[in-house]
Amino acid sequence: MGVNIHELEDYIHNIEPVTFPHQIPSFPVSKNNALQFPPPGSKDAEDRKEYIPDYLPLIISSQEEEEEEQVPTDGGTSAEAMQVPLEEEEEEGEMEDDETVNDENYLSKRPLDSPETMEMPFAKRIRLMNNKGDILDGSLEPREPLSSINSQKVPSVLSPAHKIDSQDLDVSYSDQIMLSPVSKSQAPPPSESKSLIPKTKSKGGSPGQKIKSPKATPISTVIGSPIRSPKSGPKERKSPGCAKSPKSPKSPKVPLAAPPPAIKTETPNRTPLATLSEKIGRENIQIKQNQTPLDSDQLNVEIPSKKPSIADNTIEDSIDAVIARACAEQEPDPFEFSSGSESEGEVFTSPKRLNISELTTPKVSASGINPGKTSSTSVPASGGTSSSDISWTMDDSINEVIRKVSQETPTNTPANNPPCFSSPSASPPTPEPLLKVFEDKAKLPPPVELKKKTKKEQRAKKKKDKDKLKDKERSKDKNKDRSKDKEKDKEKDGTKDGKVLWKDSNKDEDSELHRFKLKDFNEIDSKSKQKENCGKKDKEKHKDKKKDKEKGKKDKDKKGKDKTKEEKMKSPSTPIMLSSKDIALPMISTPNTVRLPSLLSSMSPLLPEKLFEEKEKSKEKDKKKDKKEKKKKKDKEKVKEKEKEKKEKEKEKEKEKKEKEKVKAELSIPAPSPVIPRLTLRVGAGQDTIVISKVVSAPESKAVPPPSLPKSPPPTPSPAPAPVLVVPPQAPPAPAAASPAPTPAPSALTSNAGSSKTPVRSVVTETVSTYVIRDEWGNQIWICPGCNKPDDGSPMIGCDQCDDWYHWPCVGINAAPPEDEQWFCTKCESKKKDKKQKKRKHKAH
């Protein structure tokens, strides 16, 4: 072989040692891990809620995974995106069932393959979430800006557009205005949004999304002032992700309307564009409304002024057609829109709602354009808000929601109005955009957090939305009767206007216009709280739902009161309501639109500054104060009630005493029977009249006086201070002095029926012994110590010393003793004997 043994040994020892023939077990022995702990950097670990232990797998339904995979493709087409929300509504029922099983209740182990599949959908979800969040950020932000559209900045850019196309341009113009303010609001945070956006793009940004974003950006640029457009551009880049959401489908259409000339072209083509935009926009709107019917309801409340204009249009016809279309197109992924937009929409349900109502309110072309633009821009805003919900405090999110709602309500009406030929100036609530800009800045950092949101949260939000919808539907049914008359009037005016109005929006608008005028801020607060709590435990969610229901009930009860108060507070908003009605007509006539700018201009400063600040701050404080005050009031009321009860009892006692005294006086007057003579003793100042009645047989009447007199003296001393009667043993002197008629007194010794009636015998004694009981009327009842039975009316004899009264049979007396003799009971006699004996002993000594 030519191999050197030493070299071979050296080789084996130093270079390639021979493996030991037996396997050496390495401890601890590794086991297959079926617990699927999320890797430290995975989204699962970030999204996992605190109350879910690490060893439990994240539960995601297979439907969600499939839907998420489909989402990127569906997001590209507007029709599919439109369909997605409708499917979401249909599938929400199924999803809820699946969710209950998969998300929370499904504890069985998953196959080892599931983690990988889980991770892929998660990445997609993150992208979708981010994209949707971005889209929501863009769309919601624009929606906020839409409401806060600065009339000053927008009119310059938009005014030409209005001139170009009176109606179509107005619609598109309003859309542009809506978008431009959004872009402005977004513009301050664009750098932040950009930093967040790249993450979203890197994670899930698909080329389609990027393409969509440019579309959204041109629209925003065209719509907004050139300064706004660049800012809106980056946010809309976020929106590209948003483009996937049903809102994004609108965005492609938006590009058509984006350039003012394009808008002009739309005006001639308005009918086809309107039809397409109506179909898509309506479907999207319906889907959005269905997905976030609560949001739409809130929007209706928030945008009551917009809704009236929408209601003016022939809503029912268009709604029926749209519903049919939406039902046909419901197949697209429900999660595509719902996962991103709904969750975010819930965070800022008011902005989405506003966008939906706005999209629907503008004419068909506007609906097509606005949905795209607003959706692209506004969606990022919602996304930002949703992420901000996680990062922000409850108060911040509530304030933002309130601001957005308040801003959107006035601004949305203007936005709708400009399409109605209102001059571009009509659209500008300038103060709102500033507020939104700050809110957007605050919100931009949170978009990254949107990634953290899991589909569980989205599902929970969907469930909440459904619950809210149910509650609202109930309240709507009640309010329908009231709103029917108004709806009829509005529909008459609205028939002249666009067909884009939806039944859902109309019904919700009319019924909710009433509700939400009262509930705008209350519900916004409660809903914003719910949105913020979405990231919290499901238990808290259920509690929030219950609270919302209770609040809704309370709000209904308080509608009458709240209407008067809010009408005073919202005097500017009421003009908007009128303007919206006028606006429906102005779609044809410009003069009404002229009214709008003035109303809007007045509205914008009043609502955002006063209503929002005062209501936001005052409501939170008022709630806390109210709770404390209620507790204090309850405690005070309890104390007062107790005091009142005590006083009442005392008064009643005093009354009873007075009545008793009166009854006694009255009873003392009539003689119970001729056989029972009465001895009336007036004690002291004659306040109490003591009647001592004894039933005596005629022959005994002569001998009766001595025992009867002892009976009278003991009662007299206690009630009155009369000193004359104080000496009980001396019976004869007392009656002689106190009673003018001593002759009847002897016969009064034996109390028969009269004595049995306690009210007749009001005998009071100082020597209260165990044998004297007071009845409920304060009268004394004598008990015979011999037989322990109360005075039953049979003749009794009283001891002149201890004032105990005995039945004659108990003492062995058959006939009344002589009047002059004193009678002592056995106890007193024994005591006297003892005393006499002691005296004798002392004398003897």
UniProtKB/Swiss-Prot annotation:
One term of GO molecular function: p53 binding
Keyword Repressor: no
Domain of life: Eukaryota
Task performed by this protein: The TFIID basal transcription factor complex plays a major role in the initiation of RNA polymerase II (Pol II)-dependent transcription. TFIID recognizes and binds promoters with or without a TATA box via its subunit TBP, a TATA-box-binding protein, and promotes assembly of the pre-initiation complex (PIC). The TFIID complex consists of tbp and TBP-associated factors (TAFs).
Biased composition (Acidic residues): 86-102
Biased segments, Pro residues type: 704-722, 729-745
Biased composition (Polar residues): 175-186, 286-299, 357-396, 752-761
Chief location bin: nucleus
Any GO BP: positive regulation of transcription by RNA polymerase II
One cellular component term from this protein's GO annotations in UniProt: transcription factor TFIID complex
UniProt name for this protein: Transcription initiation factor TFIID subunit 3
UniProt-listed Pfam families: PHD (PF00628)
PROSITE patterns: ZF_PHD_1 (PS01359), ZF_PHD_2 (PS50016)
Subcellular location: Nucleus
UniProt keyword terms in alphabetical order: Metal-binding, Nucleus, Transcription, Transcription regulation, Zinc, Zinc-finger
Complexes and interactors: Component of the TFIID basal transcription factor complex, composed of TATA-box-binding protein tbp, and a number of TBP-associated factors (TAFs).
UniProt family annotation: Belongs to the TAF3 family.
Residue numbers spanned by region Disordered: 59-120, 134-163, 175-314, 330-582, 607-670, 699-761
Zn finger spans (PHD-type): 781-831
Start-end of Basic and acidic residues biased regions: 466-538, 547-570, 610-623, 636-665
Compositionally skewed regions (Low complexity) per UniProt: 240-256, 409-425
Residue ranges with Basic residues bias: 452-465, 624-635
